[in-house]
Curated annotation (Swiss-Prot):
Coiled coil: none annotated. It comes from Mycosarcoma maydis. A motif (Prevents secretion from ER) lies at residues 657-660. Probably plays a role in facilitating the assembly of multimeric protein complexes inside the ER. Is required for secretory polypeptide translocation. Interacts with the ER co-chaperonne DNJ1. GO terms for cellular component: cytoplasm; endoplasmic reticulum chaperone complex; endoplasmic reticulum lumen; membrane; nucleus. Belongs to the heat shock protein 70 family. GO terms for biological process: chaperone cofactor-dependent protein refolding; endoplasmic reticulum unfolded protein response; ERAD pathway; protein refolding. This is Endoplasmic reticulum chaperone BIP1. It comes from the Eukaryota. It is an enzyme of class 3 (hydrolase).
Length: 660
């Protein structure tokens, strides 16, 4: 269905995008390890853009890049693919499988029987430079690895798998991440690629990559689709418009801590309780028993996608006792119903953000192994009134799309004009006077993007401004997440509001940001690239931010208006005092009586501020400003009526730019 609300501007944007066409790559697979597994918190990615290089220009990159592989770096499984001879190939690993578990095992040299060492290789989280890291035992020594290093091991295996199939070295890749990954997670994914010996040309949002797999060959006009991506550890929903090779993300939402592993954990907890009821034994703290149970629960979950019940049986489960439980599909759904329902909230959110009604959606595309759960499919069918699309392989679609993006970047002419237009998931801005979140790039803005805005100083002779960069949806920075900060120094002495400080945000196609500030008077500038710092948002915080932004919208607006009114009054007083002392301007054109009247009005206003600035409502502050303006207006009017300002040299009283 054609989007009724698409504008001429959108058409122009697409036309420009085609001229600089860009796309998404796909899969990489590799089985890595059996045993003593280190579960990888894998990153899934956003990233594409309307900007980029056209196919002709991209052809020049073929010799430079070689084959650009596409990797779906998943929480539980990873997959790799490449564009070969005009078609996408999903590459099998050395076990003959097209998807590879995202696990890493650390084993002694020459050890053939890995199972005997499993109990000696548990991992625990430790702190390393203020960030979480993984501690394991390798050859009797304790080793500490960052999440990026462990992810790099999986990426390295994917790289080797592709090289074995292609018969040549691979140096460039497109890697996918969840659409709701924040800046730190995206940067960490790029870092992992670098550690693995890969130049990550593009970080791509998983739903966008999957949309390519779904819509690359569709030529029947514009359509709007929902990509519902429920994997092993993360969940994303994106609403896209597809039109003749242009894939435009209109909105995205999700939860980077929701997926199949959560469903498994619910069942495992239930089975452990049942075992305790029967035997009186608590096996929940025994890692070996819990590990066995988890594997059986995952198998049972898969079975319940096609059968109504299954058995979970483990001989010698704990302290010589066998485990024997029956799990029905109904019980599985009961244990996880709240989580299933939780996945519908982001669906509603993207429809709301994009201004699209659910009956305007042409198709619902299922991605991720957990979308095979019958209850999930039934809920989507009930909500949209149609069967979800099952035309693509949910395990391979993301890698497939990533491989296509890799082909475009490598200059594969068989792909024609494939253009990706993606968005940023959270609003970005800086703190201005009073702790206000001044938004420069709203969420769901098309990336790459660049936005500049002029700010000024908050005090006379202020020679330094602090630029604090935040992400989030609330009106006050204290309720949002600090990404980074830096100072611009050496500002020449001047009255408040006089210097012009230009702050620029640049968000690249990978969703990674650079912020700069420049004094337009001196030309001096400073900048910061927001990277993988501690203190970045957790997935839960991201979800909470969006929810709280709606819940507290009215309250936030009242606080914002109050601070805005306070700034307006303070700026008016400062500006009026400055003009009153200017003998060449207003101060030199007033008689003594009028000047004293204005001075007294200023004194009264300042006294009121000293007493009430912390407690007054926004309306009270606005009233005080109106009273001050009313006292001054008749006096300044006399000057103009008398022709004293005929030259028009006086600047009108104004509030200036937002203050830093």
């Amino acid at each position: 269905m054609v989007l009724a609300s698409r504008t001429t501007a959108l058409a122009q944007r697409r036309k420009a995008a085609r001229a600089t066409g860009m796309s998404r790559p796909a899969f990489m697979t590799i089985i890595m390890a059996i045993l003593a597994l280190l579960t990888l918190s894998a990153f899934m990615s956003p990233a594409s853009s309307a900007g980029g290089m056209g196919v002709a220009a991209a052809a020049d990159k073929r010799s430079e890049y070689g084959t650009v592989i596409g990797i779906d770096l998943g929480t539980t499984y990873s997959c790799v693919g490449a564009q070969v001879n005009g078609r996408v190939e999903i590459i099998t690993n050395d076990q003959g499988n097209r998807i590879t578990p995202s696990y890493v095992a650390f084993t002694p040299w020459g050890e053939s029987d890995l199972k005997k060492d499993a109990k000696h290789l548990p991992f625990k989280l430790v702190e390393k430079n203020g960030k979480p890291a993984i501690q394991v035992t390798v050859n009797g020594e304790k080793k500490v690895f960052t999440p990026e290093e462990v992810s790099a091991m999986v990426l390295q295996k994917m790289k080797e798998t592709a090289e074995a199939y292609l018969g040549h070295k691979v140096t460039h890749a497109v890697v996918t991440v969840p659409a709701y990954f924040n800046d730190a997670q995206r940067q960490a994914t790029k870092d992992a690629g670098t550690i693995a010996g890969l130049n990550v040309l593009r970080i791509v949002n998983e739903p966008t990559a999957a949309a390519i797999a779904y819509g690359l060959d569709k030529k029947d006009g514009e359509s709007q689709i929902i990509v519902y991506d429920l994997g092993g550890g993360t969940f994303d929903v994106s609403l896209l418009s597809i039109d003749s090779g242009v894939f435009e993300v209109l909105a995205t939402a999700g939860d980077t801590h929701l997926g199949g592993e959560d469903f498994d954990n619910r069942v495992s907890e239930y089975i452990l309780k049942q075992f305790k009821k029967k035997t009186g034994l608590d096996a929940s703290s025994n890692k070996r028993s819990v590990g066995k149970l988890k594997r059986e629960v995952e198998r049972a979950k898969r079975t319940l996608s096609s059968q109504m019940s299954t058995k979970i049986e483990i001989d010698g489960f704990f302290e010589g006792n066998d485990l024997d439980e029956t799990l029905t599909r109904a019980k599985f759904e009961e244990l996880n119903m709240d989580l299933f329902r939780k996945t519908m909230k982001p669906v509603e959110q993207v429809l709301k953000d994009a201004g699209v009604k659910k009956d305007e959606i042409d198709d619902v595309v299922l991605v991720g192994g957990s979308t095979r759960i019958p209850k999930v499919q039934a809920m989507l069918k009930e909500y949209f009134g149609r069967e979800p699309s099952k035309g693509i392989n949910p395990d391979e679609a993301v890698a497939w799309g990533a491989a296509v993006q890799g082909g475009v970047l490598a200059g594969d002419e068989s792909l024609g004009d494939v253009v990706l237009i993606d968005v940023n998931p959270l609003t970005l801005g800086i703190e201005t006077n009073g702790g206000v979140m001044t938004k420069l790039i709203p969420r769901n803005t098309v990336v790459p993007t660049k936005k500049s805005q002029i700010f000024s100083t908050a005090a006379d002779n202020q020679n330094t401004v602090l630029i604090q960069v935040f992400e989030g949806e609330r009106s006050m920075t204290k309720d949002n997440n600090l990404l980074g900060k830096f100072e611009l120094t050496g500002i020449p002495p001047a009255p408040r509001g006089t210097p012009q400080i230009e702050v620029t945000f640049e968000l690249d196609a990978n969703g990674i940001m650079k912020v700069s500030a420049a004094d337009k008077g001196t030309g001096k500038s400073e900048s910061i690239t927001i990277s993988n710092d501690k203190g970045r948002l957790t997935p839960e915080e991201i979800e909470r931010m969006v929810a709280e932004a709606e819940e507290f919208a009215e309250q936030d607006e009242a606080v914002r208006k109050r601070i805005e009114a306070l700034n307006n009054l303070q700026n008016f007083i400062a500006s009026l005092r400055s003009q009153l002392s200017d003998k060449e301007g207003l101060g030199g054109k007033l008689d003594k009586e009028d000047k004293e009247t204005i001075k007294q009005s200023l004194k009264d206003a300042e006294a009121w501020l000293d007493e009430n600035s912390q407690t007054a409502e926004g309306s009270d502050i606005e009233e005080q400003l109106s009273e001050l303006q009313a006292a001054v207006a008749p006096i300044t009017a006399k000057i103009y009526q008398g022709g004293a300002a005929a030259g028009g040299d006086d600047e009108p009283l104004n509030y200036g730019h937002d203050e830093l």
